């Protein structure tokens, strides 16, 4: 009995002297909801980076890219975000002016996007072209130009996204402004007759489209690749318009809070390499912006290629965004 007590005491003494398991370092990433969905890149990105960093990644999702910036502005210096992933070039001037973002400090040699966008704060991770995607079984003769979309049959509906919360919605706003200029308000009034509804983010809009609520949706030239690869169908198609298609380059950046976390810079560097970039074509269904270890899926060869790329300089977007949103509101509320 005495021996048992001694052994028991010795066992507890050893346990007491053993170091406690250390909690893993954490990285908090604000992004949009489709990125972290079960079919998006988020789960695999988390898995790949956690293996590399021996850390814990926590995603916090918002409706879309514009909503991300709005949220960060509300939280200010108290934000929990180390990284914001899901902004685009249309928001960089405004995001920089907020003072909540810090230089990336990483080598961006492998990053290549149309127009050779480079920035010391905002790092591209993918890009694509906004397009009208349509259901060829319900709409055998889709609008072949932006003009035809604006002036076509009101019975043929399209689902759009809100430019105040969603980067695709903002992209559509800038697409219309690029083509119609001072006549954009009048063009919006005409197009409004074809709009079934305006959603807060891309996911809601595309969900309505695939459920058959409307034969058209604002999405990307790359969206049909998902249906070709996953669903083995070419039913859904995208259109390259003669007026041009508006370019989106998606970006990530570390916050000033995140700059104090060594994992933030490490993640941005990881984001430009194959562990992240290989996932983009078949989970985010966009073109990769960094180094990959394999070619694009064959389905991408069948996608329409815009002959003309439209992109308004970020400083001009920042200067006029509120004015153009108000123009859209006035035109579509009549």
From Swiss-Prot:
Pfam families hit by this protein: SBP_bac_1
InterPro entries in the cross-refs: SBP (IPR006059), ThiB (IPR005967), ThiB-like (IPR005948)
A cellular component annotation (GO) from this entry: outer membrane-bounded periplasmic space
A molecular function GO annotation: thiamine binding
Listed SUPFAM superfamilies: Periplasmic binding protein-like II
Chief localization: periplasm
Binding site for thiamine: 64-65, 166-167, 202, 220-223
Localization: Periplasm
Any single biological process term in GO: thiamine transport
Keyword Cytoplasm attributed: no
N-terminal signal peptide: 1-23
UniProt entry keywords in alphabetical sequence: Periplasm, Signal, Transport
Subunit structure and binding partners: The complex is composed of two ATP-binding proteins (ThiQ), two transmembrane proteins (ThiP) and a solute-binding protein (ThiB).
UniProt family annotation: Belongs to the bacterial solute-binding protein 1 family.
Known function: Part of the ABC transporter complex ThiBPQ involved in thiamine import.
Name under which the protein is recorded: Thiamine-binding periplasmic protein
Encoding gene, per UniProt annotation: thiB
């Amino acid at each position: 009995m005495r021996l048992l007590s001694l052994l028991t005491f010795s066992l507890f003494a050893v346990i007491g002297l053993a170091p406690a398991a250390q909690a893993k370092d954490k990285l908090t990433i604000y992004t949009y909801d489709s990125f972290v969905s079960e079919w998006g890149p988020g789960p695999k990105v988390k898995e790949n980076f956690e293996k590399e960093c021996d850390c814990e990644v926590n995603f916090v999702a918002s409706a879309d890219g514009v909503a991300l910036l709005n949220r960060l502005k509300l939280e200010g210096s108290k934000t929990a975000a180390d990284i914001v992933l899901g902004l685009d070039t249309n928001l960089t001037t405004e995001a920089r002016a907020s003072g909540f973002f810090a230089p990336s400090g990483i080598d961006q040699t492998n990053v290549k996007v149309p127009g050779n966008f480079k920035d010391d704060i905002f790092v591209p991770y993918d890009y694509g072209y906004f397009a009208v995607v349509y259901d060829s079984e319900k709409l055998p003769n889709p609008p072949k130009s932006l003009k035809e979309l604006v002036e076509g049959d009101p019975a043929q509906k399209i689902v759009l996204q809100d430019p105040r919360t969603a980067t695709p919605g903002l992209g559509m706003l800038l697409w219309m402004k690029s083509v119609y200029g001072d006549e954009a308000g009048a063009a919006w009034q005409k197009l409004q007759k074809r709009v079934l509804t305006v959603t807060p983010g891309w996911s809601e809009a595309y969900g309505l489209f695939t459920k058959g609520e409307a034969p058209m949706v604002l999405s990307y030239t790359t969206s049909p690749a998902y249906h070709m690869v996953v669903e083995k169908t070419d039913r859904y198609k995208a259109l390259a318009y003669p007026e041009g298609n508006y370019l989106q380059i998606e970006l990530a950046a570390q916050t000033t809070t995140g700059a104090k976390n060594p994992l933030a810079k490490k993640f941005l560097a990881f984001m430009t390499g194959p562990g992240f970039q290989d996932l983009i074509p078949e989970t985010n269904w966009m073109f990769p912006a960094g180094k990959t270890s394999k070619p694009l899926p064959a389905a991408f060869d069948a996608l329409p290629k815009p002959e003309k790329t439209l992109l308004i300089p970020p400083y001009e977007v920042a200067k006029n965004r509120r004015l153009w949103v108000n123009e859209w509101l006035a035109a579509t509320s009549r």
